[in-house]
Amino acid sequence: MIRARTFTDARQQAHSNAELHWWIFMRISGLILMFLILGHVYMTFIQVSESDATFDAVVNKLANPAWKFYNWLILSLSLLHGANGARYSIEDYVRSRPNRAWVKGVFYTVIALLFAFGTVGLFSI
């Protein structure tokens, strides 16, 4: 686990390249997610008046492939970002190796199911 604020410190603390890449991913994905979600909130709640937010308007918006990809990008990045953050917590609080393996296995299965159901739900509209 890397507990660093700067890239130099992170590189010194990393036990593997994968751990360093996850550390970098968390910084980049957090920044990207911030702009994606702010854009989504603006386009969904500020740009559209409340009277125009009908079921048909939402279905028409989600029929657009660009809007589907935008939502899928938010879904996939947020699940990866959240799963990696939860991995840090699991490593910190589940001390026993066998228990940690079980907790991670169940957790990653739930994340995979959320991703699969979210993707199917998003692209079936």
Question: Where on the chain are the PLM-derived regions?
Answer:
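Membrane-embedded alpha-helical bundles that constitute the cytochrome b-like, heme-associated redox core
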Residues: 1-125
